[in-house]
């Protein structure tokens, strides 16, 4: 896929990011950048570090050394980040986990508006309105009152995407987004991601799905042994 029109400076930049767990080097100097409006796919075998990179970008995984830059915000290794820096980071990033992690006892709409109200201080009425708009954008407004267990896999994923977009982040991270989807749902997701890019989002996706990555990604970064080994 050709690069998106109008791409500007990097929204995301990783420089020589390293992570060890005991004697194992999980990330061995990961360096790459992502421009605004790109869909970048991280591919590689299990254990290559794809999901770890996403969690690290989102501030969910500490790392020993290197730098992660998200727009004008710099995250450093070895725990040298203030609570305020991490709070600002989470306003810039939305993450969709492989297994969604929706709260099973809460309706879909509450799953979307809960974090903006309680973690980001968004007024309740504004957060509810935003949740309704996002569910409509993603085509699941009719499931607003459904519990997660009542949703299909595709519906649950769309609610999870709505939740990730609830604080209007410029960067969206997705871990194995096609894992539970059939061919038709994959096509729907591909179209949705293009729509999100058209609205000014930037996406980084970790996936094993070669066909999906090649059909929707601006670039594919291939990881092996904790580093980016090639890109195409």
PLM regions with names:
Residues 147-151, 155:
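Conserved ABC ATPase signature
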Residues 183-185:
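Helix N-cap at the start of a conserved alpha-helix in ABC-type nucleotide-binding domains
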Residues 172-175:
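Catalytic Walker B motif of ABC-type/P-loop ATPase nucleotide-binding domains
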Residues 58:
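Helix-to-loop junction immediately C-terminal to a conserved catalytic motif
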